């Protein structure tokens, strides 16, 4: 049996401090999850990539141990809401695994958890383990990007996946025919997740490069960026340098009402050619001028 301590109402600027304390108290595992099922999108430089409302889960072997940690945390931070849950063996793994089911995007692309067989073995199947980082296709922004990629002609194209997260867009692009993808992120955990998922899908170094954004040098046919509005605007000139005239830029990670702001900000360097919406989020397609 296992005992899970669930910590809510935790200010983002205290999360690192609390997770360090949990490690000192001997937590067997510590997991951060999103209260509202939002994705972790590329933050502005110098900020920590966290959801607006984070829940911390800490696993302990003894009830007394978990209760003691709960009391210590609440005594120091009365605003925290801490609850205990008894978990049967392996339920702590199954809890999130059961929620991740195979999903289809477009006509031929499936995103499947690594522990389940693909529903259509002959389809384009991307095997994904989201436990290491973020991005499973369940959020509207990721779904918009995957659907666009599935419908696009990616054969022999070079692509930058800016803010790669779990690597889901990079790997999908390769599975759909891209010649080479540059997966970049400012978060080392995201780069590690992308590498792990690439290995699970038998993706080679000749198909995928994984790095921080500073390593980008070569122009590409397409950039796809599922990141927030502020970094998207700040990256306009950088994207323009990496895209020859007529090349495509696909952006998501922005709300419907933010779309006009990005279109206006990009007008000097890019031509807006298409927009898709899903659950209040938007995907914008541009060509480089």
From Swiss-Prot:
InterPro entries (alphabetical): Ribosomal_L11_MeTrfase_PrmA (IPR050078), Ribosomal_PrmA_MeTrfase (IPR004498), SAM-dependent_MTases_sf (IPR029063)
Pfam families: PrmA
Main location: cytoplasm
Protein location: Cytoplasm
EC number: 2.1.1.-
Residues that coordinate or bind S-adenosyl-L-methionine: 142, 163, 185, 226
GO CC annotation: cytosol
Keywords, in A-Z order: Cytoplasm, Methyltransferase, S-adenosyl-L-methionine, Transferase
Enzymatic reactions: L-lysyl-[protein] + 3 S-adenosyl-L-methionine = N(6),N(6),N(6)-trimethyl-L-lysyl-[protein] + 3 S-adenosyl-L-homocysteine + 3 H(+)
An example Gene Ontology molecular-function term: protein-lysine N-methyltransferase activity
SUPFAM superfamilies: S-adenosyl-L-methionine-dependent methyltransferases
Disulfide bonds: none
Single GO BP term: methylation
Superkingdom classification of source: Bacteria
Described purpose of this protein according to its UniProt entry: Methylates ribosomal protein L11.
Membership in a protein family: Belongs to the methyltransferase superfamily. PrmA family.
The name this protein goes by in its record: Ribosomal protein L11 methyltransferase
Species of origin: Legionella pneumophila (strain Paris)
């Amino acid at each position: 049996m296992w005992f899970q301590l669930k910590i809510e109402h935790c200010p983002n600027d205290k999360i690192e401090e609390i997770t360090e304390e949990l490690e000192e108290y001997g937590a067997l595992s510590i997991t951060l999850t999103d209260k509202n099922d939002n994705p972790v999108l590329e933050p502005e430089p110098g900020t920590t990539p966290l959801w607006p409302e984070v829940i911390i889960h800490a696993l302990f072997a003894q009830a007394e141990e978990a209760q003691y940690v709960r009391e210590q945390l609440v005594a120091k931070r009365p605003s925290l809401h801490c609850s205990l849950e008894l978990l049967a063996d392996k339920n702590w793994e199954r809890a999130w695994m059961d929620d991740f089911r195979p999903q289809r995007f477009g006509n031929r692309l499936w995103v499947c958890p690594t522990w389940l067989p693909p529903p259509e073995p002959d389809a384009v199947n991307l095997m994904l383990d989201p436990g290491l980082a973020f991005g499973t296709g369940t959020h509207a922004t990721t779904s918009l990007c995957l659907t666009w990629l599935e419908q696009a002609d990616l054969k022999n194209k070079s692509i930058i996946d800016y803010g790669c997260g779990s690597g889901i867009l990079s790997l999908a692009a390769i599975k759909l025919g891209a010649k080479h993808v540059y997966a970049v992120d400012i978060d080392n955990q995201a780069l590690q997740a992308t590498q792990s998922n690439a290995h699970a899908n038998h993706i080679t170094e000749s198909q995928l490069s994984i790095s921080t954004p500073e390593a980008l040098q070569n122009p590409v046919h397409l950039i796809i960026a599922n990141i927030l509005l502020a970094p998207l605007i700040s990256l306009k000139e950088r994207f323009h340098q990496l895209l020859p005239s007529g090349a495509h830029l696909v952006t998501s990670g922005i709300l419907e009402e933010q779309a006009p702001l990005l279109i206006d900000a990009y007008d000097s360097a890019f031509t807006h050619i298409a927009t898709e919406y899903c659950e209040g989020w938007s995907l914008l397609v541009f060509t480089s001028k």
